[in-house]
């Protein structure tokens, strides 16, 4: 993702380059990064920035730091792209998207079309037909000729390529060609990589001029009026006590004169949370994926089940917004361990502290919980998925 430009054509009273200016409540680059982070097929993101922008960049992408590798670019787009490709090389990707950081409105359906079209021989280029009449003018602004726009298209990004081929193309161009290429498909054409075009998206604008911010703000406002696909799942689990020396809650070992009875480690909190996460995909419950009768799960850590649910969500392009767990028990006391439990969930879920709630209550001495025969857990999870709620 290229974000090393200075954005001088965009003009502004603000001192920051266009990719760091606010679009709504977030910088432009934040919107762009989010589009790729939400797609399950994107495994690594290299963000190429201007050497002077590291501090402002890190502030802008706080929400996505764990998803990005920052690389400093060069004096030209071509040099910056090559540095990004070199940084990506160690990950041995099969394909690579090359995208302008100032295009913040990439839709999931465009990425899907690119992924189903690209192959090991050809690159993929989203394009839009040119509709305006084109004129060639001279230095004094006199019209020289009218250019027929039949078969003329404007190129967009992301452009997708077989990684090794586009890397070789950029390296060859840097070594032997003095021509300055304006996009990566031009380098691919020069190198002999066939480019397959697909229909682009008229909303996938590149913010180049100051007026483009007005267009972007209007489109963002329209998008915010859509109904986002936000799903909530609930989970419930209960385990009885048996003789033991400790029990596991939220992955944390708690010294106690009893343990929770179960086929796995009987982590009642993780079981409830796993079911809540699975519910956002209509994916059944833990027992659907991990049969209680299967000996391989005997005494297994419940984090395995939780991470399985996380992978299902990731494959669907989901992002967890928050989780809430309520433990219902007369004993042991949960308070002394709540902070450690929360930290463990922060690491597993990659969520900040304010997006995780763990609390405990008693059952006021009523029922089996009141008789100190076991522990119950309730969990709620909110997950955001790409797209809108179907009409």
Curated annotation (Swiss-Prot):
Residues that bind 4-CDP-2-C-methyl-D-erythritol 2-phosphate: 237-239, 263-264, 285-287, 361-364, 368, 371
Keywords: Isoprene biosynthesis, Lyase, Metal-binding, Multifunctional enzyme, Nucleotidyltransferase, Transferase
Annotated site residue numbers, Transition state stabilizer: 9, 18, 263, 362
Record region (2-C-methyl-D-erythritol 2,4-cyclodiphosphate synthase): 231-391
Pathway where this protein functions: Isoprenoid biosynthesis; isopentenyl diphosphate biosynthesis via DXP pathway; isopentenyl diphosphate from 1-deoxy-D-xylulose 5-phosphate: step 2/6; Isoprenoid biosynthesis; isopentenyl diphosphate biosynthesis via DXP pathway; isopentenyl diphosphate from 1-deoxy-D-xylulose 5-phosphate: step 4/6
PROSITE patterns: ISPF (PS01350)
Alphabetized GO MF terms: 2-C-methyl-D-erythritol 2,4-cyclodiphosphate synthase activity; 2-C-methyl-D-erythritol 4-phosphate cytidylyltransferase activity; metal ion binding
Annotated site location: Positions MEP for the nucleophilic attack: 149, 206
Binding site for a divalent metal cation: 237, 239, 271
UniProt key word Metal-binding: yes
SUPFAM superfamilies referenced in this protein's UniProt entry, alphabetically: IpsF-like (SSF69765), Nucleotide-diphospho-sugar transferases (SSF53448)
Reactions it catalyzes: 2-C-methyl-D-erythritol 4-phosphate + CTP + H(+) = 4-CDP-2-C-methyl-D-erythritol + diphosphate; 4-CDP-2-C-methyl-D-erythritol 2-phosphate = 2-C-methyl-D-erythritol 2,4-cyclic diphosphate + CMP
EC number: 2.7.7.60, 4.6.1.12
Residue segments, region 2-C-methyl-D-erythritol 4-phosphate cytidylyltransferase: 1-230
The family this protein is said to belong to: In the N-terminal section; belongs to the IspD/TarI cytidylyltransferase family. IspD subfamily. In the C-terminal section; belongs to the IspF family.
Protein name: Bifunctional enzyme IspD/IspF
Organism annotation: Bartonella quintana (strain Toulouse)
Gene that this polypeptide is encoded by: ispDF
């Amino acid at each position: 993702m290229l974000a090393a430009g200075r954005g001088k054509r965009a003009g502004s009273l603000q001192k920051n380059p266009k990719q760091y200016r606010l679009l709504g409540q977030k910088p432009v680059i934040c919107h762009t990064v989010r589009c790729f982070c939400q797609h399950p097929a994107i495994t690594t993101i290299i963000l190429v920035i201007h050497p002077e922008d590291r501090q402002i960049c890190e502030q802008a992408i706080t929400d996505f730091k764990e998803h990005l590798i920052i690389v400093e670019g060069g004096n030209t787009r071509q040099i910056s792209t090559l540095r990004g490709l070199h940084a990506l090389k160690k990950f041995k990707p099969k394909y690579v998207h090359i995208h302008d950081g100032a295009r913040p409105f990439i839709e999931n359906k465009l990425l899907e079309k690119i992924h189903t079209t690209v192959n090991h021989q050809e690159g993929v280029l989203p394009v839009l037909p040119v509709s305006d009449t084109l004129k060639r003018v001279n230095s004094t602004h006199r019209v020289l000729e009218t250019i027929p726009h039949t078969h003329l298209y404007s190129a967009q990004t992301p452009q997708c390529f077989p990684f090794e081929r586009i890397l070789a193309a950029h390296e060859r161009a840097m070594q032997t060609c003095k021509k300055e290429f304006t996009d990566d498909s031009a380098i691919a054409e020069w190198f002999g990589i066939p480019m397959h075009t697909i229909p682009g998206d008229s909303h996938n604008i590149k913010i180049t001029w100051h007026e483009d911010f007005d267009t972007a703000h209007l489109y963002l406002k329209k998008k915010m009026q859509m109904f986002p696909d936000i799903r909530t799942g609930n989970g419930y689990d209960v385990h009885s006590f048996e003789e033991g020396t400790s029990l596991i809650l939220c992955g944390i070992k708690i010294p106690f004169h009893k343990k929770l009875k179960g086929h796995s480690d009987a982590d009642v909190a993780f079981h409830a949370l796993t079911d809540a996460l699975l519910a956002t995909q209509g994916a059944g419950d833990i027992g659907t994926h991990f049969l209680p009768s299967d000996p391989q799960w005997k005494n297994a850590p419940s984090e395995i089940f939780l991470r399985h649910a996380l992978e299902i969500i990731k494959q669907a392009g989901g992002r967890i917004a928050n989780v809430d767990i309520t433990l219902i028990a007369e004993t042991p006391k949960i308070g002394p361990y709540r902070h450690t439990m929360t930290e463990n969930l922060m690491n597993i879920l990659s969520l900040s502290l304010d997006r995780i709630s763990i609390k405990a209550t008693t059952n006021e001495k009523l029922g089996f919980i009141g008789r100190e025969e076991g522990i119950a857990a309730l969990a709620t999870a909110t997950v955001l998925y790409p797209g809108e709620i179907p009409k």
